[in-house]
C-alpha cells in the first residue's frame, strides 16, 4: 500500500514491520509463515466483534487455522478507520488493507460475515461462540496534553473536533486550527483535506516538523509540499495552551 512502515523500521533500528503482512520479521523468532497456518486440532467457533483491520485480520487467521468464524461489524461496510482514512488525500491505496481481507474471507466456507450488527455484551454472550475476539477499536480524545504527552485537562467545547468528527463530516467553522500531537501522517492529511474543502487552516504541533514522524517513512517533504500547495500555515514547536470555544492560545 506504500505506507513505508517497513523502511521506518530500518530508520528506527527495530525489527521490520509490515501493514499488510503481520508475519513479516517474525518468521524465525515466532515461527510464523505468511501463507502456512497450523490447523487447530480442536475445531470450534470464533466470534470476532469489529470489522476494522484488526478484526478482519483476526478473522482471516482464525479461519485459515480451521475455526468456524463469524465476524460482526456495527457499520454498513468493512474496514473501520482504514476505510475512512483512505478517503483522505493521497491515502486511497490504504483501502487495500480492507479490500484484500474482505475478499479473502468471502471466499471461505467457514466464515460468516455480518455488517449493521451492533452487538452489546448480552448479544455477544448469548451468541454462544467458543472464543470471542474484541476488535472494536478506539476513539480520539478531546484533551490538552503536557510536554510529556500526559493528558492534563479535557477540551469539552462543541467547537473541538477529533479525526472521528472529520470522517463523519461534523466539522464546522471556516477558520480552523489543526493541533497535531500525534506527529505521524494523520494531522497533516487532515489539515490538507480541510483546506481543500475551503477552510482557512492553521497547523500547529509541538514537534519540530509537521507530521514529524513521516521523516521515518521518507514522506516528510511530501507533507510540506501538500500543505504549502493548499495554503496551510504551519507552526512547529508550538503547544496548545487553552481554548475557550472562541480563541485558542498557543505558545
Where do the model's predicted regions map?
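Cysteine-cluster motifs in flexible loop/terminal segments that predominantly coordinate metals
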Residues: 1-39
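Flexible loop/turn segments at secondary-structure boundaries
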Residues: 6-14, 25-28, 55, 77-81, ...
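Glycine-rich dinucleotide-binding loop and its adjacent helix/turn
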Residues: 23-39, 104-107, 113, 141-197
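Ferredoxin-like iron-sulfur electron-transfer modules
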Residues: 32-49, 54, 85, 117-118
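Beta1-alpha1 glycine-rich phosphate/pyrophosphate-binding loop at the start
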Residues: 48-112, 178-222, 233
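A Rossmann-like FAD-binding core segment of flavoenzymes
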Residues: 95-141, 155-156, 164-165, 171-172, ...
